[in-house]
């Protein structure tokens, strides 16, 4: 028995799981759900759910690369907010989320850090949790960003970046933050 589902009502993955539960031998799916009308069952989402349910045990760390390849080959873009392989799938600029991830990392608990605010562990699909700085960020976001970029965490630098983030209506990009860093970092000639 084969099952072939579409995304007309957004239930491709759920219906595929139910089909397998009911005894289907095979379910059809496509990378990033590419298919007629609104698409077929998204293979990437199906595989991740099968893995998380313990129904399969596969190395999914190249799934993102595969979906990027499918996107380029077909000309179908991956939306930024697409689950698992979208640009924003593992990004957060929210203070409470970042604080929990950072706290787990500081305790050496990478397993928890990868799951505390994500229903899918980023490492399972070859990705990483990314902490950004924006208007909903906390001080810990700024400290983490500086640390991740090898920049010493100094109070005046943290305060300046944090203030700029709070005045913004969006996530700050790396260039904006680096500009603030360079503006507040003494040059070698001034020392």
Indicate where each model-derived feature is located.
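Active-site-proximal loop/turn and secondary-structure-junction residues that shape catalytic pockets
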Residues: 5-11, 31-35
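Hydrophobic faces of well-ordered beta-strands that scaffold small-molecule active sites
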Residues: 1-5, 27-29, 46
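Glycine-rich phosphate-binding active-site loops on the catalytic face of alpha/beta enzymes
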Residues: 22-39
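Secondary-structure transition/capping motifs at alpha-helix termini
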Residues: 20-27, 53-57
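Catalytic cores of alpha/beta
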Residues: 9-22, 41
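A mid-to-C-terminal "edge-of-domain" accessory segment
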Residues: 56-191
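Conserved, mostly hydrophobic/aromatic
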Residues: 23, 46, 146
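C-terminal helical cap(s) of enzyme catalytic domains, especially alpha/beta-barrels
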Residues: 35-63
